[in-house]
Amino acid sequence: MTTTSSDELPRQADDDSMKWDRIYIQKLDPEVIFTKQERIGRGSFGEVYKGIDNRTGRVVAIKIIDLEQAEDEIEDIQQEIQVLSQCDSQYVTKYFGSFLKGSKLWIIMEYLGGGSALDLTKSGKLDESHIAVILREILKGLEYLHSERKIHRDIKAANVLVSEHGDVKVADFGVAGQLTETVKKRITFVGSPFWMAPELIKQSSYDYKADIWSLGITAIELANGEPPHSDLHPMRVLFLIPKNPPPVLQGSQWSKPFKEFVEMCLNKDPENRPSASTLLKHQFIKRAKKNSILVDLIERAAEYRLRTGVSSDSDLDEDSDGGGGTSKWDYPTVRGPRVSADDDGTVRQRTDRPRAQVDRRSPSGSPGGTIVRGSPQVAAVAEQLRNSSVGSSGYGSGGNSASSQYATSSLPQSHTASSGGATTITLGSPNGSPTSSLARTQSMVSPSGQRSGSAQSWELERGNRPMSERVSSQVSPSKYNQHRTSSSNGVQGGSGGRREYINGSGSGLNGNSSNQNHSEYSDAVRQRGPGGSGGRLDYRESHVPTSSQENLNHGRMYGYGAPPPSREANNVPMPRVKGALDCSLLPAIEHLSRTRHATAALDQLRHVFRDVEDSCPGICNELIEELMQRIAVPQVSQSDLDAAIRRLTTPPS
């Protein structure tokens, strides 16, 4: 093998961070040597394909990375190749070499056709005997890595791969770290929040014992199908793990040795946490059976993937949502700046490139995103969560939930357009959206649509008050209703109950002042590409304040053009007539919550429907009517359609 010169690879401003001379890259054409077959997943930095080595006929896994698109991840790619090339263990995925063709880097690895341990949990509950075998093999992999003074730092079921014959191997070394004689403990902030050790979250020095904590969380994940706190926002979990007692494995179906094993792994004091070698001697592990008992489980998972279309993956796959996956959150990996160690080139200082986005995924919102610790923004958010009170975790609730605080506060100051000390956000519908029956009704109520400056916009005051009191709103419902049917900025509910600001191309406003404010805000929040539906800001970066929705509600209830009532009047609860929300939507969501579709996103959807109905009474009825019209017409007669709508929107007598 020969090494390529640095000129053949993408250059960064800081050339010291690009020490590719320590990584062997072959100059041969990989498309000649390998036959690329179907895509089998998406890893840390690129797509993974099944392939054939034409020289030997061996089946391999091919990870293909576009280095031009993955510029921010080059050091992590470098780290993964470095660690893989140094490992030689039957419990760690094997690395066969790397090839560069143009800007595409081909990483050739061992193919494991059974998918991940996470895939095994998706096809059904795991028995304790299966879990014991998987944990034993992970422990053997960790024992090897720790003996080589390497920390994996991202142990979880998705990063444990299995072969079709029951072999279990540790994979995905994108955030692995090296312990040297001079650097015996790490101080960086990386890993997946749900599996992260308390000492790592607190940014204390840590060592290989952090992997043991992650193993304990993985044990609970294998038993329950999800890690502890999976119904909470990842940023809130970062606050809870150091503060709360360690999770415990609950359920009478689990044996006492299994529960004791988990308890030993989840000791909050790393000094009292056992090593991998010690845990291999534990009763629960010693009585584990042979790997062959996993074969039936692997075949069951393969049948499930064929039936549902869910692809296996070393991380969450973009396509898995469409195949019936039920993950409650995108379980992201936090990748942080590395502290440079000796001159062995393994651990390097990350460049100080600003990281404005919390989520690196494409605008389509594929899972498997990455929270970046490249700037102090995440640290500030985490510190705010530690200092703030923990409220309700429900989306859109009146209380100050930690996740809501994070979603609001994570929008950088530079991304907020201001005019006279206030921020203007204009609401509307996306381009080309059909005019609903609700919009037609509202446009009839307010035909003029002419209002003066402050009544045409939604102003968010920015001051030194708490976040929950920092918003005051002035809304012209007539302008809002007129603007809903124009091609402008819209608020939509995304998948998983998220709300997104979608930047439209048209102005949809009368008056230069409002147009200017709308343009300033659109430019401020546009972080992914130009206008249109492509320039979107995720719910986790911003959300619509509840107080603004309340003022919008009062604007509709108390007459168009009339000033909203005082805050004292806002506190008076308005009686709500039962309709489609209570008769159809909430019961349907409640039914789904008792099935395999029960997710945090479903709970958020329930809150969203309630918030929308509170803001605009009767809108759920309109929604049901609109849906029924689109589904039934012209196949169903109008009388039958009216009867069906009445059943869905009227309480039973």
Swiss-Prot record:
Gene (UniProt): gck-1
Domain of life: Eukaryota
EC numbers on record: 2.7.11.1
Protein name according to UniProt: Germinal center kinase 1
Reactions that this protein is recorded to catalyse: L-seryl-[protein] + ATP = O-phospho-L-seryl-[protein] + ADP + H(+); L-threonyl-[protein] + ATP = O-phospho-L-threonyl-[protein] + ADP + H(+)
Protein location: Cytoplasm; Apical cell membrane
Phenotype seen when the gene is deleted: RNAi-mediated knockdown causes sterility resulting from several defects in oogenesis. Proximal ends of the gonads are filled with small germ cells and have a decrease in the number of nuclei in all stages of oogenesis especially at the pachytene stage where there is 60 percent less nuclei. In addition, animals lack a discernible rachis which is a tube-like formation of anucleate cytoplasm between pachytene nuclei, no clear transition into progression from pachytene to diplotene stage and a failure to progress from diplotene into diakinesis. Increased germline cell apoptosis.
UniProt enzyme class: transferase
Residues holding ATP: 40-48, 63
GO molecular function: ATP binding; metal ion binding; mitogen-activated protein kinase binding; protein serine kinase activity; protein serine/threonine kinase activity
PROSITE patterns named among the record's database cross-references: PROTEIN_KINASE_ATP, PROTEIN_KINASE_DOM
GO CC, one annotated term: cytoplasmic side of apical plasma membrane
Function: Serine/threonine-protein kinase which is required for normal oogenesis and suppression of germline cell apoptosis. Inhibits phosphorylation and thus probably activation of mpk-1 during pachytene stage. Involved in excretory canal elongation during postembryonic development, probably acting downstream of ccm-3.
Positions with biased composition (Basic and acidic residues): 345-362, 459-468
One GO term (biological process): meiotic cell cycle
UniProt keywords, alphabetically: ATP-binding, Cell membrane, Cytoplasm, Differentiation, Kinase, Magnesium, Meiosis, Membrane, Metal-binding, Nucleotide-binding, Oogenesis, Serine/threonine-protein kinase, Transferase
Organism: Caenorhabditis elegans
Domain Protein kinase: 34-285
Keyword field contains Cytoplasm: yes
Main location: cytoplasm
Positions annotated as active site in the UniProt record: 154 (proton acceptor)
